[in-house]
Amino acid sequence: MTQDQLKQAVAQAAVDFILPKLDEKSVVGVGTGSTANFFIDALAQHKTAFDGAVASSEATAQRLKGHGIPVYELNSVSELEFYVDGADESDAHLHLIKGGGAALTREKIVAAVAKTFICIADGSKLVPVLGAFPLPVEVIPMARSHVARQLVKLGGDPVYREGVVTDNGNVILDVYNLQITNPVELEAQINAIVGVVTNGLFAARPADLLLLGTAEGVKSLKAE
């Protein structure tokens, strides 16, 4: 199977998982990226089964609207049963690295509201230790150099992602060469740097369920 076929299979598995638990009042949190796009396309086949969605990026909002799915502001929604999103890496505890698509801050906010966070990914994303994928950090533009110096002190090698402005008007530093043995601690350390909006570690609030697309089929993992 190609990587796209694996993503498609795992996206369909996520729809199959949440669909029986949705009703006409349900609002679904939807992530950003190529795997999330497959989820949106599969979810759109059942758009009469739920009320609408909260999007974690402008790109996701446009794709949802293109399918005729109502998109709500998070501030107008009191609860989200599910948030479904992809990841760049996951460990066995379902701590994640996200943010390759630069939507990490809104993704983290929507995940924080959701009762159940379902991560969908192809099998290559499950790793023993996080950090081979560079860790994205969203930064207030004027603080970029200051934050980069602090990230070097933490052992990282930050690189400015040129030409990228987030939906919030900020910039991204991608931090290479981190061996992330304690994701919860590192997430807090980086977020404590003045000028950081948030970083791509989803460890304080990890995924609740990881659906993994493999050649043998979709595997379902809960945190160890």
UniProtKB/Swiss-Prot annotation:
CDD domains in the record: RPI_A
Domain of life: Bacteria
Organism: Pseudomonas putida (strain ATCC 47054 / DSM 6125 / CFBP 8728 / NCIMB 11950 / KT2440)
Top EC category: isomerase
Signal peptide extent: none
Annotated EC: 5.3.1.6
PANTHER family: RIBOSE-5-PHOSPHATE ISOMERASE
Reactions catalysed according to its record: aldehydo-D-ribose 5-phosphate = D-ribulose 5-phosphate
Protein biosynthesis recorded as keyword: no
Annotated family: Belongs to the ribose 5-phosphate isomerase family.
Pfam annotation, one family: Rib_5-P_isom_A
Cross-referenced SUPFAM superfamilies: D-ribose-5-phosphate isomerase (RpiA), lid domain (SSF75445), NagB/RpiA/CoA transferase-like (SSF100950)
Keyword Isomerase belongs to the record: yes
Binding annotation for substrate: T32, G33, S34, T35, D85, G86, A87, D88, K98, G99, G100, G101, K125
Pathway where it operates: Carbohydrate degradation; pentose phosphate pathway; D-ribose 5-phosphate from D-ribulose 5-phosphate (non-oxidative stage): step 1/1
Lineage of the species this protein comes from: Bacteria, Pseudomonadati, Pseudomonadota, Gammaproteobacteria, Pseudomonadales
Function of the protein: Catalyzes the reversible conversion of ribose-5-phosphate to ribulose 5-phosphate.
GO cellular component: cytosol
GO molecular function annotations of the record: ribose-5-phosphate isomerase activity
Key words of the record: Isomerase
Gene3D superfamilies on file: 3.30.70.260, 3.40.50.1360
Positions annotated as active site in the UniProt record: E107
GO terms classed as biological process: D-ribose metabolic process; pentose-phosphate shunt, non-oxidative branch
Protein name: Ribose-5-phosphate isomerase A
